[in-house]
Amino acid sequence: MTRVSFFQKEDLFTGFRAEGHTGYAPAGSDIVCAGVSALLQSTVVALAELLAIPVELKAEKKTGLMICWLPAAVTGEQKEKADLLFRSAHLGLLRMAEEYPQHLEVTIKGGAEDAEAF
């Protein structure tokens, strides 16, 4: 199962942590894994290229780990724009989790200053 937790601080999404493999199908033909990867990777690319936010990123292919969080130096306006991108990914993943509940879990966690705490 893939578990995705979105970080929230002061009602704004500030990042996410995804871990695990969906197990829906063998590697290379797992549509659930492909969907999760596409949504999360698109979010990271949009943050960097559309909003010019140098996100903090940690990824490990073997474990399926991907952690993305906003650096401390982002402005209030950047945080608000990033929140919209994170919420878009969150909504897409929630819909996927409704269709594939045994393969994908999506949660929101708040309060941690450092994404590595998740």
Where are these regions (language model features)?
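N-terminal intrinsically disordered, cationic/polar leader segments
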Residues: 1-31, 41, 45-118
